């Protein structure tokens, strides 16, 4: 069976994924699917770095503004929604382009976890999320307790092996449903950190404080409020930190998040990274996409 070709753009926050996605959509007749766990929420526009109205006018975007802030959203929900969006985009002769930094969501979609058959997908994804909370040492101890031996151990292989052990009959014959071209964007760490600092300053100037205050006053305990960009400002509203301190914390936590994102994609998904500072960027990516689409 021929697998549908899709483009997947990943990388740390503030590296330019949205801009590249829009450019590729224009060049290759594509539509964008957000792969970000926070951009599904309505009313949370600035802190989630959601594509602006102008940017959304340049390319059709899917899975943005599809949940109220009071609703929960999971990897299971994303897989369902993304599959429907891909089917819709392909049915109209267009190219699906997934843009986002929520690694667990993308891995769940790309690695063949189908939503039909005997396997309870909610149970599978809940088990994976449980495994993701374990340290490397705890993972390897769990492997040993189940009699699983891996010659070369990394987190991705460890988690996959534990899933197979837990759901062997349902998972062992599944294949990845898509043929993805993985595109990773990166840059020197200090350059990314400077981009993050400038982005936070721009967000604050654009109304992030008011957006965060609304969330704090109306829905302080919902899942959406736990995302980076909001909870760091809550101590200011509670009188526990100055605005300067809260903003500095937001920058620091965003930088740490970007580092975790890079580590996650490098360790757990087969991603080729391109530096946005290279003279060949973005033409080299355009050429790669063109070759990929011409392949049988």
Swiss-Prot record:
It comes from the Bacteria. Residues 36-39 are annotated as: Interaction with substrate tRNA. One of its GO terms (molecular function) is tRNA dimethylallyltransferase activity. The record marks 102, 128 as: Interaction with substrate tRNA. Substrate binds at residues 13-18. ATP binds at residues 11-18. One of its GO terms (biological process) is tRNA modification. It catalyses: adenosine(37) in tRNA + dimethylallyl diphosphate = N(6)-dimethylallyladenosine(37) in tRNA + diphosphate. Monomer. Belongs to the IPP transferase family. This is tRNA dimethylallyltransferase. It comes from Streptococcus equi subsp. zooepidemicus (strain MGCS10565). The gene is miaA.
